[in-house]
Every structure is written in C-alpha cells, then in structure tokens.
C-alpha cells in the first residue's frame, strides 16, 4: 500500500514538472497556466474588498502605463497585466498569479522616481513570470501529499504533521532566493524597457532605510523591532550585498546609453497624494481617532497603539496583552442593543450587563463569560451598529483592564465642529528647495511626530543625515 502511494506521489511530481518561462529551469508545479489565470482573477476580487483602489484616475492610469512598459519586456508578455494602486498606508506591494499586481500608496510615497516605481512593479512582474506563488502552492501541496502517504503507511498521524512542518519550512526557505530572483528579472525588464536598472538597488535602499528607522524607533520605545516587511529583512546595506549586486549585474549589460530615471515627472504625479490614514478609513492622531465620514471620535489610554484597517479598528497595549477591536455593522432596528448583543453571542452567557447612555445615543455592554472572558458592547447610531470586543491574553486579566476598556467605549461621541479638520488626511506636497533651506527648517512646519525630520528624510531618500540641494523638488507634508 505504502509503495503504491509513493509511486502515485512520484508520478504526480513528474506530471507537475514544467519549464519555467523566466529561468528555463524545470520547476515542480501542480497548476496549469489556465488555472493560474483563473486563480488570480478570483482572488483579485477578494483583494479589492480588503484593499480598495485609491481614488485618483490619473495616478491609476500612470501606474498602469509604467507597469505595462516593464511587462512588455518580460518573459510572459502575453499576459494581461493589471496594475492597481490600493488605498493603504502600508509600505508594501504584491502580486497574484496571472498578472494582478498591487502597490500600496504607502510605498509609493517613499519612492523618488519613475524608474523606482518601475523597479517595484518590475520586481512583482518577476514574481509572476517566475511563477513564484504557483511554485510555493505546488511545494505545499506536494509535502501535504507526502505527509498523507506516510501517515497511511505507518499509521502514525504525527508523521503527517512533521511532513507539513518540513514542507512549510522548505517553502519559507525559498524567500530570499525568490526575492533575489525577482530583483534580477525585474532589473532585466527595467533595462529592456528603457529604465535605469540601478533603480532596483535604489528601491532596496529605500526599504533598508525604512527598516533602520523602524529599528531605531523601537529601541527608543524599549521594544523589539517588528519582523521584516516588504522584501523581508536586510542583513547588509544594498551597496554591500554581494548576492543582490550579482543578480542585478546582468541587467546593467542590457542597458543602453540613455536609461530613463524620470524623477521630476514622477514627483509631480505624487503632488496631493494622501499620506498615512485616509479619510475613508479614519485618522489616527496620537491616542485619538477621528472619522469625518462617519462623524465620530474615540480616545484610547495613553501609550496604546492603534491599528487601522478597512474593516476593523484595534487599540492595544504596547505589550499587546490587552486589546479592543471596533467593527461596523448594519442595525436591525427590530432589536434593542441588548438583544443585538445576545443574538451575536448565541448560546454564550452575558453577565454584568448595563445600558449605555452616550448623550442621545443608546447602547449596551456586558461581559461574555467563557474560558477567556471578553468585554463586549454595541452602540446604535442611525443605521449603524458600532460593535466593540475587548480581550486580554498572557498574564493580563480582564478585571485589571476592564475599566480602561469601558473608558474607550464610553469615549465614543460625534465630532465637534473644531475637530472636523482633525479628520482630514495629511497629503504630500512638493516644494522647490531654496538656498539656505535645511531639512530641520522644512520639517518644523510639517504635521509630523517627534521624529518628523527623520520621517521627512525618509520620504525624500535622504535618511539618515542627507540635506536637499537648492532647486531640488522635495516632498513635504501638510
């Protein structure tokens, strides 16, 4: 029985071998190109629910043009590539199978030329042409099959779990290699498309500076730095990264004499770009949250951090041991706030319930009993129900944090007229540097945090100690 299963697995592996269109190597894949295209089209709709398109038709068209210019020089130029700027402050970009590529406006803000934009898009095109997501999916499937075969053959389910762990580790181990491969392919597409392939190195410098800044900020707060973001973690500076320089090298040989950078044209396209939170998702300012479209504000305890996503707002303690999440749902006006909560928790028991009176607004709050007790609440306003769920983990206890949870819930109120300005987003604006101007002076008038000068340098590729030149276009915030 075991031999037959292993034979089937080997046959599946042989059937799944295909020549990679970008590298010419035989890759193990268990998905046809047609299936790849169908998968990308299906998940594109899900992605756009989570990350809506940024509302700027001119900028969207520009990004599509730059992306198509790079993709035309790729190994899979027959695909219909779709490049989308998503309305998210995250520094990120990613690709789905089949040619759906997304760049977050948070990353776009830190780029400083059209060639750098082309480098980001070219890197993601490289992931598509090399079928990285397809290869990862196929590796995971194959290791899962191996685990099933071993479990059946030995009668020990733990063997299957071990194989899955090995498989996941194997796929994760591809991370650095795949990123470098995408860098090399993207640089080739840049050069063939008429852009300077050095822009790929410049983008990695931008990301390295982001990582260094985040590490410095975490150290000031006495925290550990977060895990690597877009493109992973960098052990060395890009100029000294031997493997990175090696994969970019062949692209330099393809470059002609007039490779395009397009700094000023690109910066003009960014003038007015929303930076940080958008009006549609609400604005975080210190420990306060303001939402102009929904007309409300919330206040959190001093030192808490806020995570703002399209579908949820989360406030949590610095050690992430206590958090409160708020989501928005439609009101069923046949139900009172108390009935709404009871319906939501089903057969779980609510205790210590009490009505909430927030001016003219009505709500209800209670503790949801169970192995991990939670504070829950709902506030009715118009056609919306604002649902709060608060919980603790680790050494924290609900009793110790509950008063602060209630203070957050009870801080909900409509905006005052003077606060409406606080619900408007910060935007990028271009200024031409005058003789004698410094980053210190330019940062003093910007709506930035305590390290605003460092933040402004990051935006302009001048971190950590660079200064602008007279006559240079510079990104500022207001």
Task: Describe the predicted segments one by one.
Residues 293, 299-313, 399, 403, ...:
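K/E-rich alpha-helical interaction surfaces of small helical-bundle regulatory domains
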Residues 452-478:
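Extracellular LysM carbohydrate-binding repeats and other cell-envelope/extracellular binding modules
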